[in-house]
């Protein structure tokens, strides 16, 4: 038996962050879409349980319970109880690490979908979402890879507004941007504007209208502190903003990945090719945003 699942990159079109609560958690409001680029997770029957990471960034991935795929398997087996057969889980890691793309959460979501298929096909979506939500703030949002609005600590999910097809270029300068460090810099540097969501407009029919709405009413509150910690993120944003194909340039999540929204696939392809030529030391991917893929 071999099962495979796609683990798409998550992109925050906006991320509004409030001040920390008494427990130190920050309330957020975010519109999350998913890309048609990402990692892959596969499951195979085995005599003993094992986990391995392959792919371009596989060597940077922990293979113990520091990895969300391993923790996802442990959590689901604990939820099911009783004896369960062993599996070999393989992660093909194509996304950069600590990149603001929800890669770990998306990998865990893919693993949970595969494990449910193999171990407990009758387990409800709600039960699987509860397991995913226990793995981290993005866990439930990244389980299905479908566009969502996230509130609270990221666990309050609602369907995203209807949007036209979005063509984008993802760029990462191949420097890590640890979430905890960025939030600490955010707390130290700014007076929070608050996590209130923007006015959600229906009937956005073109990418130009989407970009005008994003630019006029939304932001990523973690972008400035992330750039302060790692100026190379700012270099990415400046380069993208200067290119003619870019309608909007912004950072995703806590970085370091940034995205440029483009009018169409041809424009995104041209921008990606030019960035790759200018900065061969950066990770660059043309993609579509939406989901599920």
UniProtKB/Swiss-Prot annotation:
Name of the gene this protein is made from: ispE
GO biological process: isopentenyl diphosphate biosynthetic process, methylerythritol 4-phosphate pathway; terpenoid biosynthetic process
One function term, GO molecular function aspect: 4-(cytidine 5'-diphospho)-2-C-methyl-D-erythritol kinase activity
Superkingdom of origin: Bacteria
Positions bound to ATP: 96-106
Swiss-Prot/TrEMBL catalytic activity: 4-CDP-2-C-methyl-D-erythritol + ATP = 4-CDP-2-C-methyl-D-erythritol 2-phosphate + ADP + H(+)
Active-site feature positions: 10, 138
Biological function: Catalyzes the phosphorylation of the position 2 hydroxy group of 4-diphosphocytidyl-2C-methyl-D-erythritol.
Keywords: ATP-binding, Isoprene biosynthesis, Kinase, Nucleotide-binding, Transferase
Name of this protein: 4-diphosphocytidyl-2-C-methyl-D-erythritol kinase
Enzyme class: transferase
Family: Belongs to the GHMP kinase family. IspE subfamily.
This protein's pathway: Isoprenoid biosynthesis; isopentenyl diphosphate biosynthesis via DXP pathway; isopentenyl diphosphate from 1-deoxy-D-xylulose 5-phosphate: step 3/6
UniProt EC number: 2.7.1.148
Species, as recorded: Caulobacter sp. (strain K31)
Matching SUPFAM superfamilies: GHMP Kinase, C-terminal domain, Ribosomal protein S5 domain 2-like
């Amino acid at each position: 038996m071999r099962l495979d699942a796609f683990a798409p990159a998550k992109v925050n079109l906006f991320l509004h962050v409030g001040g920390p609560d008494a427990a130190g958690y920050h309330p957020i409001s975010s519109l999350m879409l998913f890309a048609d680029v990402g990692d892959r997770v596969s499951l195979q029957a085995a005599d003993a349980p094992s986990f391995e990471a392959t792919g371009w960034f596989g060597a940077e991935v922990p293979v113990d319970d520091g990895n969300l795929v391993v923790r996802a398997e442990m959590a689901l087996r604990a939820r099911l109880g009783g004896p369960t057969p062993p599996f070999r889980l393989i992660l093909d890691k194509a996304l950069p690490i600590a990149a603001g793309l929800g890669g770990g959460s998306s990998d865990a979501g893919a693993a949970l979908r595969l494990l449910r298929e193999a171990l407990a096909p009758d387990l409800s979506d709600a039960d699987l979402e509860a397991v995913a939500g226990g793995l981290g703030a993005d866990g439930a949002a990244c389980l299905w890879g479908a566009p969502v609005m996230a509130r609270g600590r990221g666990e309050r999910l609602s369907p995203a507004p209807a949007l036209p097809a979005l063509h984008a270029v993802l760029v990462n300068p191949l420097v890590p941007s640890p979430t905890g460090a960025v939030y600490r810099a955010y707390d130290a540097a700014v007076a929070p504007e608050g996590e209130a969501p923007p006015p959600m407009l229906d009937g956005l029919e073109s990418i130009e209208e989407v970009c005008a709405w994003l630019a006029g009413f939304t932001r990523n509150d973690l972008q400035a502190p992330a750039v302060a910690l790692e100026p190379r993120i700012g270099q990415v944003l400046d380069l993208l903003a200067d290119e003619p194909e870019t309608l909007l340039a912004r950072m995703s999540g806590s970085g370091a990945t940034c995205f440029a929204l483009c009018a169409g696939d041809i424009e995104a392809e041209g921008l990606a090719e030019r960035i790759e030529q200018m900065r061969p030391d950066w990770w660059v991917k043309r993609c579509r945003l939406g989901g599920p893929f």
